Amino acid sequence: MRTHLFIITAITLASCQTKQHKVEQLSTIDSTLQVKATSILESKLSEINAQSGRVIIMEVQTGQIKALVGLTRRDNANYQPCENFAIQCPTGLMHPISLLAALETGKVNLSDKVNVGEGIYKIHDRELKDHNWHRGGYGEITVGQGLACSSNIATYKTMEEAFGNNPQSYFDLLAKMNYGKPDSIAGISNLKSAHFITPKDKEWSGTAWAWFCIGYNQLISPIQTLTFYNAIANNGKMVQPQLYKDSTVVINPQIASRASIDSLKRALQYAVTDGLGKPAYSDKAAVAGMQGTAQLEDDSYVVEFCGYFPANNPQYTIIVSINKTGLPVSGSLMAGDTFRQIVDTLYLSLIHI
């Protein structure tokens, strides 16, 4: 009996070891890139005295996650690994997504003029402001320039032009594009569906749309935002993020027309070369992307940059999301610079393939 028990135990252990070995072999994570991305993020968090941060690097065509880095600091101690990649909050990266929806209507294009005035736009009882309102605003600019300078007013006025007084049609289009997906990812615990306040909700108000289209009135995780940006890089094909190697799963074969996608890709590259995204500019490879900052309910901030490279033939999409208490905050100077450092590291690995 004891001999039989030993054999059963040995087989069980061997089976567990085989399964563990299989999981290790099938992991999509590049261990070298994971270490380098961790070092880059930790250095930036320390430099700006941030509370926590996340970096996720995805392979454009397959959705394979090549690095998944999370760091947090408690009680002013050293930064420690954090595995909560399901955390959701408002995002400063909504402007391009709203613009893509507007482009899909065919009623606006990047060269259209939009007057943002002195940087303050009254909507019912609230004021929508651009970041430079205290310097007199941008005046009349193009839709493309509005994206490059992260103009909240340009984004909302573009939505008004595209959708008129029918915000529900905007939300219907976002749903058609699968914004906020996926709802679950193998290997990421507790990921929930993104939460949006829409005209169908009791929380809806006359100002809700203006703030939604720039990233508020919603809760979304960085990896869900990354999934949408990756679809832009992938010419409209949205694929499921994967932490374990498997066949590529397509969420949406074409989130928007190729013409709209191409227009947005030009705008995202312009945002880095000529807009507020310049800190993400790399002299090693052309990049495209968007920076953003969102203020949270506890008066802390999330600063982000999401983009892809090479811009003309995207191989990787990267999101950098940093949580920081107190000013100053800057999506471009903080998250964008981190993005650039990661791009430079990835570029070196690409040229050695």
Question: Over which residues does each language-model region extend?
Answer:
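Short amphipathic alpha-helical signal-transduction/dimerization elements
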Residues: 233, 272, 340-347
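A short acidic/glycine-rich loop-to-helix N-cap element
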Residues: 324-334
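Short, basic/aromatic recognition patches
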Residues: 38-47
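Conserved small/polar residues in nucleotide/adenosyl-binding loops
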Residues: 351-353
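C-terminal motif of bacterial Sec signal peptides marking the signal peptidase cleavage site
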Residues: 14-15
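Beta-lactam-recognizing serine transpeptidase/beta-lactamase-like catalytic domain environment
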Residues: 24, 29-33, 51-88, 100-322
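Short amphipathic alpha-helical face segments that pack within enzyme cores
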Residues: 92-101, 222-227, 334-341
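Positively charged n-region of N-terminal signal peptides that target proteins for export
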Residues: 1-4
